[in-house]
Curated annotation (Swiss-Prot):
Residues 1-21 form the signal peptide. The keyword Membrane does not apply. InterPro entries: Spidertoxin. The lineage of its organism: Eukaryota, Metazoa, Ecdysozoa, Arthropoda, Chelicerata. It comes from Phoneutria nigriventer. This is Kappa-ctenitoxin-Pn1a. Residues 22-37, 78-83 form a propeptide. Disulfide bonds join C40-C55, C47-C60, C54-C71, C62-C69. Belongs to the neurotoxin 02 (plectoxin) family. The keyword Cytoplasm does not apply. It is found in: Secreted.
Length: 83
């Protein structure tokens, strides 16, 4: 009888923890993805040290003295193939 009570209490505890857990904390959460986009630079915007990082892991190209850095398109995008 004592074992059944312990199992019941454990089950109720796990159910309560499951209900109280954050509903969608996955890295693909749309709110997190949208927040990341707000913190990144689009194509041909400034990027690099002191600026935002490039969206969609685009390359951040700088001139020879490492200033005037901008986000560039992927090579495949230049030919119209997408990412």
């Amino acid at each position: 009888m004592w074992f059944k009570i312990q199992v019941l209490v454990l089950a109720i505890t796990l159910i309560t923890l499951g209900i109280q857990a954050e509903p969608n904390s996955s890295p693909n959460n749309p709110l997190i993805v949208e927040e990341d986009r707000a913190e990144c630079a689009a194509v041909y915007e400034r990027c690099g040290k002191g600026y935002k990082r490039c969206c969609e892991e685009r390359p951040c190209k700088c001139n020879i003295v490492m200033d005037n850095c901008t986000c560039k398109k992927f090579i495949s995008e230049l030919f119209g193939f997408g990412k």
